[in-house]
């Protein structure tokens, strides 16, 4: 007889992934609005069923917008509360697939990074990119140490080994702290063990990110810095300028292109500010590498 899997409640989920106390209290209060209204709670449960069936879809977007209106809370806050409620179900799915509770916690902790981003940038407890979490909840993206990974159809031939259309691993970099070289190496090794090699005895890794944009990286990353060492691990196969500088909020924690409003308190902020002030733009780099752990 299969052992019953105990599911956490929302407060336990938030505690496990280290939400700030203020955020815990906020989402407890928001969740209580659903508990007090039988129709609202019924809607929340049915939307969770829809989410795990179809994930991000027009129907879900429409139904969630009604919850924003009925509760009076900001959409980013309701979105996060919905994901926390859905995480209760996700914990059971992880357990059924044989993953440890610690592995579940490490993966779902991305919600903590996102709630802190939203608070720092917008002053709201919530999540700015609800759709992004689909990869977490459909178990296509996994956090392994410092980085996250999912399979991806490669766009370019690389190194006479990797071909366009091959399955490779896409690296994502959560805002969970510095990119220490030893943490990056440990994560690569974990990915190699978890997914297995993709090309011979090597694992093909790629990332398409603003952090790998050569004109910016080679000007503002000091030699020997964590960011520079991460950048130098990749061969850049393509780059594109982003005239909207859509990712600078990740450094300045403000969603504005008005340079006069950008803080220059950290070294990275100062260097990126000077880069932008000179009339240059950020962009995206498509980087690849082949990884095999050292014995």
What is the role of each PLM region?
Residues 2-179, 197-204, 215-295:
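Non-catalytic substrate-recognition and accessory regions of acyl/acetyltransferase enzymes
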Residues 208-212:
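An acidic- and aromatic-residue-enriched active-site/binding cleft used to recognize and process polar
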């Amino acid at each position: 007889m299969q052992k019953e899997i105990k599911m956490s409640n929302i407060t336990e989920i938030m505690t496990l992934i280290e939400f700030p106390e203020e955020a815990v209290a906020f989402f407890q209060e928001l969740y209580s609005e659903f508990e007090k209204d039988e129709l609202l709670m019924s809607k929340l449960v049915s939307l969770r069923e829809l989410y795990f069936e179809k994930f991000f879809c027009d129907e879900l977007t429409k139904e969630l917008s009604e919850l924003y209106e009925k509760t009076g809370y900001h959409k980013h806050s309701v979105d996060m509360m919905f994901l926390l409620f859905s995480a209760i179900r996700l914990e059971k799915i992880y357990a059924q697939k044989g993953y440890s509770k610690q592995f579940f916690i490490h993966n779902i902790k991305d919600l903590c990074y996102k709630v802190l981003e939203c608070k720092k940038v917008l002053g709201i407890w919530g999540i700015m990119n609800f759709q992004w979490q689909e990869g977490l909840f459909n178990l296509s993206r996994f956090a392994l140490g410092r980085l996250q990974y999912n399979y991806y159809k490669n766009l370019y031939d690389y190194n006479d080994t990797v071909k366009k259309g091959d399955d490779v691993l896409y690296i994502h970099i959560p805002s969970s702290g510095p990119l220490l070289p030893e943490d990056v190496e440990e994560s690569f090794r974990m990915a190699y063990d978890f997914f297995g090699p993709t090309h011979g005895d090597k694992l093909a890794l790629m990332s398409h990110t603003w952090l790998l944009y050569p004109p910016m990286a080679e000007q503002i990353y000091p030699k020997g810095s964590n960011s520079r060492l991460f950048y130098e691990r990749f061969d850049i196969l393509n780059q594109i300028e982003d005239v909207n500088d859509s990712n600078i909020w990740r450094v300045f924690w403000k969603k504005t292109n008005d340079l006069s409003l950008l803080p220059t308190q950290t070294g990275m902020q100062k260097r990126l500010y000077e880069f932008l002030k000179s009339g240059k733009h950020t962009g995206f780099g498509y980087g690849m590498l082949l990884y095999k752990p050292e014995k």
